[in-house]
Amino acid sequence: MKQRIWKIGLLMFLSGFFVNRTFAQECKELLGEKEGKYYFQNGTIITAKDRQTAIVTYNDIKKGNEYFSNGYKNFVEGNYKSAIEWYNKALKLGNTDASCNLGYCYEHGLGVEKDKYKAFECYMRSAQVGDAIAQFNVARMFEYDKKYEEAVEFYEKAAKQGHMTSQRKLGNYYFYSRGVRRNYTTAVQWYEKAAKQGDKEAQIDIAECYYDGAGVAQNYLEAVKWYVKAANQGSSDAQYQLGYMYSEGLGVTRDYTESIRWYRKAADNGDADAIFCLANKYYNGQGVTQDYDKALELYHKAADKGVYQAMYVISECYTYGRGVKKDLNQANYWKQKAKELENKNK
């Protein structure tokens, strides 16, 4: 209830004079007042001395909103200096949305010189009156400075208001024990909230939790469900994982054709491991007609992306003349290159 009042920012209730009688009654009950003669300013409930004061205050917030809208319009059009002027005017009338947007301008040097301290100050001003985006930005800046306990405090504030990215970040904090004690169950709960809002990374995170049995009982079918959601949003990681799960029959019936379909999607998105696995399918004839030429082409693409396993297979192709003319010099070259990269990655 209090949060709802806070988000309104400034409203006036005077014995039902207010535009929304239901909300006015809620405020009356919340405060335990009988007469209900008060107005709200910047999230603080103040007893109204007279009706005129309340009306003047209401006009200020209305004007502040207009100034903010002008600022935002100029910002979108790229007129950053004008935007800042309007934001400052709005801020003087208590518009905290303007403060958050000013923070963005200071952080990125739009219309003003970059100043992360002023940016933080502006974000914090909005965060303290419940602005979820500002809370996220405050948390992000704390995180950048490795102040994880402070970061988790503000991620949680934003997450509880439904801020999607903050929910995922909070899940990460619990999963990896950043600023809080590790708790996989709590991590999964936050991942799921973000995932249900469509956060692609959170969908992968919760899929991995089900895959590994971290915070939940291991459930490959549930993992597949979440990987599919992320894959359909273009995640090459999820597409690769689906290719693997269909290839191995994890949570689904083994299906090499379906495996290839997902590997190909991931490969088209540049996923090096997917390119290598797709090459293996052509090399072994799993789900496709065996084709050494196509396999070798894909192995070279994977090798160019640093997959040393692909280099070993290229060496094998030159050793036995598969998809290429037999050439022991080339075979040795690729084998040595693979060894060097493998040792470097250890």
Label every PLM stretch briefly:
Residues V19-A24:
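Sec/Tat signal peptide C-region and signal peptidase I cleavage site
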Residues C27-G43, Y58:
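Short aromatic-glycine-(Arg/Gly/Cys) micro-motifs in beta-strand/loop hairpins
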Residues A48-I61:
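A short, charged, amphipathic alpha-helix used as a generic interaction element across diverse proteins
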Residues D60-K62, N74, K92-T96, H108-L110, ...:
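Short helix-capping/linker turns of helical repeat alpha-solenoids
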Residues E66-V76, C100-H108, F136-D145, K169-Y176, ...:
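Hydrophobic face of amphipathic alpha-helices that form TPR/SEL1-like repeat modules
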Residues S126, Y312, E316-T319, K325-N343:
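TPR/TPR-like (Sel1-like) alpha-helical repeat modules
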